[in-house]
Amino acid sequence: MKLPTLTFAAVLAIVALAAPHAQEAAARIEALHFHHVHLNSTDPKAAAAYYPKPFALSAAATTFNGFEAVKTGNVYILFTKVATTPQNELTGPQTSVWHFGWNTPNSRKYDENFRAMGLTIAQMWDAADGKLVDLSSDTLPGLPTQEQILEMRAKGTQPTLQGGFGYLRGPDGAMIENAQSGTTERFNHVHMYHEHPECAMQWYTEHLGARRPAGRGGVAAPAATGDCHTKTYAPPTWPSFAKTGFVRDPAGSVNFDDISISIRPWPGGGLVSTRGKIYDHWALSTADLEVTVTRLKREGVKFLEEIHPWGNSRAAMIEGPDRIAIELVEVK
């Protein structure tokens, strides 16, 4: 039996159908850019004045679109005045936003400066049976489990005291990371909790055009195949804000421009809406809000707020995985 010959056009069609779904999604999504993090504050002006203290090279207090603000690089931190101190992870149920933060060229020197300025450090436990420390490099290396900590102690292993990450406790209880990387101080990430990190990454990619970080050789990291729901979480490791340790994996991240939406798992789910809490939402900008809103509605994305005036522009609000509120602002 003679098999039919495929035409060149048919071959091209097959290749096109076989292209990764994430690449197709990115190609059809209009450009969205990271715009701001929006906090609730009892004193927005004082809150905005805080950030240039720890991050003097990259943060400046200003106003934007009617809000007290911090300008850092190409993004803003905005503040809305509220009557009572907003809930954070210490005073209320956990939301999907864990913290946001800066890359710094020397996290230990920055930490020393923070203490000299009298800023509050959010310390971490270095082990289940250990002590509170400022930086991850004050702990035994490698983000170890308690079993690994005991093994390293027996071998005489010591903390490196080089680089690492630590945290400030800022105005209204906001947590702000100081993470050594590169040679330039810059705002670089929002750190999220998601029950199913892979599902969240797929959602950000498919609906918002986020990019997965490049792997080895600069090649885009491929999306995982099959069921994205997490079946097994890694054991807890240290340092940790909880003495019982912190579940760090499976983790992940996506990028909007050079801002990372970094993800740690939240086993068991139950994260509450970010609205009204310390980190109310974060925002992306679009050149054509009507186009973006129409597409997202067609894709079945949940809307919290329809298109409305936003200062001298317009905005809308959607809800993403684990009840993260994401504002869409129009920037022509």
Named regions from a protein language model:
Residues 27-63, 68-69:
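Mature N-terminal segment immediately following signal peptide/propeptide cleavage
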Residues 1-6:
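Positively charged n-region of N-terminal signal peptides that target proteins for export
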Residues 21-29, 112-192, 214-255, 262-265, ...:
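Vicinal oxygen chelate
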Residues 7-18:
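Bacterial N-terminal signal peptides
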Residues 42-58, 110-117, 196-212, 296-299:
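Amphipathic alpha-helical segments
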Residues 38-43, 102-105, 192-198, 284-287:
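Short, surface-exposed ligand-recognition loops at beta-strand->loop->(often short) alpha-helix junctions
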Residues 58-65, 211-220:
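Conserved catalytic-core motifs of GNAT/GCN5-like acyltransferases
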Residues 34-39, 77-79, 97, 176-178, ...:
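Short, structured motif recognition centered on aromatic/hydrophobic residues
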